Amino acid sequence: MGCYSSKNLKQSKRTILEKPFVDIGKVYILGDELGQGQFGITRKCVEKTSGKTYACKTILKTNLKSREDEEAVKREIRIMKHLSGEPNIVEFKKAYEDRDSVHIVMEYCGGGELFKKIEALSKDGKSYSEKEAVEIIRPIVNVVKNCHYMGVMLRDLKPENFLLSSTDKNATVKAIDFGCSVFIEEGEVHRKFAGSAYYIAPEVLQGKYGKEADIWSAGIILYILLCGKPPFVTEPEAQMFSEIKSAKIDVDSESWKFIDVKAKHLVNRMLNRNPKERISAAEVLGHPWMKDGEASDKPIDGVVLSRLKQFRDMNKLKKVALKVIAANLSEEEIKGLKTLFTNIDTDKSGTITLEELKTGLTRLGSNLSKTEVEQLMEAADVDGNGTIDIDEFISATMHRYRLDRDDHVYQAFQHFDKDNDGHITKEELEMAMKEHGVGDEVSIKQIITEVDTDNDGKINFEEFRTMMRSGSSLQPQRELLPIK
C-alpha cells in the first residue's frame, strides 16, 4: 500500500520547492521526536524569534525516489495551505528546504493521539457512551466533509492520522497527515492503490475509486468505536481484502447487542459497498444518530474499550517478538536471503524499490498482480521510507520462512521470560513492553487473558507460539514471496 512511487531518481542539486535553501536550525530549535512516517520524521520545535512551539516534519530527499515522490511532497504542502483555517485540520505555518531535506512546519498538537480521548472518556471503571462516540467521530467526518467540499480526497483516513490539539478535556481533534491526499474533481476516478489495510474501501482494492472511499474509512473507524475492532481482521491480508470486497458486515452479533439501531443504520450506510449509494459526509453529520441529543448516553459495554486497547497493542507485542527473532538469525541462516536480496537489488543501492521488487518476483516465478506487489512492499517496508533495506527484507521473508521453526520462536519467548522459568508473567511482559514503549497495565493484562488459554495467569511457550502463528497484521503479504 502507501502513496508513493519507487522509481529511482538520481539526486540533483535543483530544489524541490524551487526557492532558496534555508538552514532550519537557524530559525527553529529542533526538539524531541514526535513520530515517523513514510518519508521522514516529525519533531517538536520552537521558533527562535517568538518562542512558540510547533511541529516540524522533516522529509529526507534521499527518501524521494522519483519525480512522483517530489510532486507528492509539493502536493502535500499545497493541500495543507489550501485547507488552512479549517478547525479540525492542523494549521500549516511554512515549508523550508535545505540541501538534504524538506521541512514542513505546522501547528503542534500537544494532546497526543486520538485514542487518548477515548481513554479520557472512560473513567471510574466505566466505558464511554454512544453520545461520546459521536464526539469522536463527528470531527473526523467533518474533516472529510470539508476536504471533499474543498476538492481534496484524503485516501488514508485512520485514527493514527488524528491528534488532540492539547491535553484539555475539550481539546480539538485535528487531522495531521495529508501525504496520501490528492486534489479531486467531482466524479473523478482514481486508480492508484493507496490507504491502510483495515480501513481501505472495496473499490480501492478494485482499482477504481473516488472520494466516497473516505466515507468507507470513516465508517470503519465508527465501527471500531462501537464494537472495539474492525469488521475484517482475517489473515492473511489477501483473505481480509477478499472479505472487504464481499463478506457480510456484522452488526448483529453479541458485540452489537446493546448498540442503538440508529447507529447500526448509519454504519451500514457508510459501509455500503456501492460507492454511488454510500452516504455522503454531509449526510452522515445530519443523520439522526449524529444529531445532538439523539445518541444514547448509556455507556457502551466496557469490553469494547478493552478490545480497542488490545487491537492496538497485540500487533506491537508481535513486532517486538519478530525483531528478536530477526536479530538472532545467524549469518548462515540468512546467507540465502542476503543472496536473494542482492539478486533483486539490481542497481546495488542497498535497498529494493517497488520496480525492483516487481521485476525480481517475476524472475522468481511469481505472478502477483501490481496491487499485490504494492501490498507486499507496504508490508515489508517497516520504516515506511518507500524502499526495503536488508533488515526489513530478512524480517519479511523470514516471517513465513522462520515462524514454523520452534527454536526461533523460543528465542523470542526467552526474551520475555527473564527468569527462564518457562513462563512469561505479567511483570515480565510489562517490563519488555515498556522497554519498547508499548502497552499499559490494563492492555497488558488483556493480552495475557487473550493468550493465556489455560488460565494460569502466565503465558507458557505453547501459548506464545500459538499467538505468534495466529493471524496478525504482520503475516499477510510477506507470505506471497515465493520462498520455500
Swiss-Prot record:
There are 3 contiguous domains conserved in the CDPK subfamily: a kinase domain, an autoinhibitory (junction) domain and a calmodulin-like domain. The autoinhibitory domain (295-325) inactivates kinase activity under calcium-free conditions. It comes from Arabidopsis thaliana. Residues 295-325 are annotated as: Autoinhibitory domain. Ca(2+) 1 binds at D345, D347, S349, T351, E356. This is Calcium-dependent protein kinase 31. CDD domains: STKc_CAMK. May play a role in signal transduction pathways that involve calcium as a second messenger. It holds the Pfam family Pkinase. It is found in: Membrane. Ca(2+) 2 binds at D381, D383, N385, T387, E392.
